[in-house]
Amino acid sequence: MKVRASVKKICDKCKVIHREGVVRVICTNPKHKQRQG
């Protein structure tokens, strides 16, 4: 899980979702997991 100021899709399988007011990126590749913080 990377915590970043700006979250972006890294590959085609990445999805940007809003969960409880937090922007997250979920992907099949665990290295691509990100959270805005």
Curated annotation (Swiss-Prot):
InterPro entries tied to this protein: Ribosomal_bL36, Ribosomal_bL36_sp
Keywords: Ribonucleoprotein, Ribosomal protein
Annotated Gene Ontology cellular component terms: cytoplasm; ribonucleoprotein complex; ribosome
GO molecular function: structural constituent of ribosome
HAMAP family xrefs: Ribosomal_bL36
Matches recorded under NCBIfam families: rpmJ_bact (TIGR01022)
Designated name of the protein: Large ribosomal subunit protein bL36
Organismal lineage: Bacteria, Pseudomonadati, Acidobacteriota, Terriglobia, Bryobacterales
